[in-house]
Regions:
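Phosphoinositide-binding peripheral membrane targeting modules
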Residues: 1-21
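Acidic, Ser/Thr- and proline-rich intrinsically disordered linker/docking segments
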Residues: 15-87
């Protein structure tokens, strides 16, 4: 199983954090995309280290604390939320 390596994700390099969910027929899968310059890294909640990734991202200045409530409801409906944008 893949694992999140926070050493490769310095907060100073993150330009944008976007959360969205994918309909997996019987469940929703919460996903996250991190923009680093011209590179996008994608993660999902089933990865080992997801909780550590979220804790890491909350240290970004102005990070949207209630992103989960906004992206998770209503169930089985496409939702996308930008939780951080570097200005």
């Amino acid at each position: 199983m893949a694992q999140v390596d926070l050493d490769l994700l310095p907060l100073t390099g993150i330009d944008k954090v976007t959360f969205y969910k994918r309909d997996e027929i019987t469940t929703d899968l919460i996903c996250c995309e991190l923009l680093f310059g011209d590179t996008t890294w994608s993660f999902h909640e089933e990865l080992v280290g997801w909780d550590s990734l979220i804790e890491h991202l909350t240290r970004l200045p102005g990070f949207l604390a209630d992103w989960f409530a906004q992206v998770s409801q209503p169930p089985f409906e496409n939702r996308e939320i930008v939780a951080f944008t570097r200005r």
